[in-house]
């Protein structure tokens, strides 16, 4: 029998809610009467091209998430729930090690981005299969200034080639796992997964994300997310 490779998604949901004014994981804050992370899982759960979901959660949260979210909402594709690490890259690495061995493509997505669309997910998989790595991003709208330590402007880059990076970040599984296996101390400053590949000289493609694909980190973001969901329901 032919071995059919899998497409997996790692949902990183280990962040705290300090900027939300909460002392617990922001992923469990209610968005239209459902936890934020439940909205995120649901998008991937409903896609035929996604075979398994790996959840990375905060320390001591595995059983809570299993009983309060996975069982309550009946998610079937969640194959593993693992605890995160000290930094985001540690959490992602834990997730990568929990992925099925027959995985060919892996998406890494923020649990706090529940407004991701299926079109972006599908395009990211196609591009990653062809190129090895791609990220969703949107062109920056504001002028960006680079300063020195004295808060003096030293350069104003052209906006034409500046992108605000989102998730999913999608990779050929063997490629991103190898990159994480060979992390160097300098990679500790990496703020996204693509940077770890970039450090090894790999090319990372960009696909257009969406300005609605926000990461919910503040109370204001929650209000915006509720309005976006309302607009989608009403077909506006």
From Swiss-Prot:
It is an enzyme of class 2 (transferase). The keyword S-adenosyl-L-methionine does not apply. Pathway: Isoprenoid biosynthesis; isopentenyl diphosphate biosynthesis via DXP pathway; isopentenyl diphosphate from 1-deoxy-D-xylulose 5-phosphate: step 2/6. It comes from the Bacteria. Its EC number is 2.7.7.60. The record marks 19, 26 as: Transition state stabilizer. InterPro entries: IspD, IspD/TarI, IspD/TarI_cytidylyltransf_bact, ISPD_synthase_CS, Nucleotide-diphossugar_trans. The record marks 159, 215 as: Positions MEP for the nucleophilic attack. Keywords: Isoprene biosynthesis, Nucleotidyltransferase, Transferase. It catalyses: 2-C-methyl-D-erythritol 4-phosphate + CTP + H(+) = 4-CDP-2-C-methyl-D-erythritol + diphosphate. Pfam families: IspD. The keyword Transferase applies. One of its GO terms (biological process) is isopentenyl diphosphate biosynthetic process, methylerythritol 4-phosphate pathway. One of its GO terms (molecular function) is 2-C-methyl-D-erythritol 4-phosphate cytidylyltransferase activity. Catalyzes the formation of 4-diphosphocytidyl-2-C-methyl-D-erythritol from CTP and 2-C-methyl-D-erythritol 4-phosphate (MEP). Belongs to the IspD/TarI cytidylyltransferase family. IspD subfamily. This is 2-C-methyl-D-erythritol 4-phosphate cytidylyltransferase. It comes from Alkaliphilus oremlandii (strain OhILAs).
């Amino acid at each position: 029998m032919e071995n059919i490779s899998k497409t997996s998604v790692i949902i990183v949901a280990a962040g705290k809610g300090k900027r939300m004014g909460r002392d617990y994981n922001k992923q469990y804050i209610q968005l239209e009467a459902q936890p934020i992370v439940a909205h995120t899982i649901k998008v991937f759960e409903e896609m035929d091209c996604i075979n398994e979901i790996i959840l990375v959660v905060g320390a001591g949260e595995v059983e809570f998430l299993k009983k309060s979210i996975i069982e309550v909402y009946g998610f079937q594709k969640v194959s593993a729930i693992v605890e995160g690490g000290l930094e985001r890259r540690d959490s992602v690495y834990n997730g990568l090690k929990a992925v099925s061995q027959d995985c060919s493509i892996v998406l890494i997505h923020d649990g706090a981005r529940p407004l991701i669309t299926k079109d972006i997910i599908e395009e990211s998989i196609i591009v990653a299969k062809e190129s090895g790595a791609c990220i969703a991003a949107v062109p920056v709208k504001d002028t960006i200034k680079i300063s020195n330590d004295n808060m003096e402007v030293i350069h104003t880059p052209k906006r034409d080639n500046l992108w605000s990076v989102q998730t999913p970040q999608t990779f050929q599984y063997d490629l991103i796992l190898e990159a994480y296996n060979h992390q160097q101390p300098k990679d500790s400053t990496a703020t996204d997964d693509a940077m770890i590949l970039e450090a090894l000289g790999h090319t990372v493609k960009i696909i257009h994300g969406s300005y609605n694909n926000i990461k919910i980190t503040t109370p204001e973001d929650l209000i915006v997310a509720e309005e976006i969901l309302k607009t989608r329901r009403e077909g506006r």
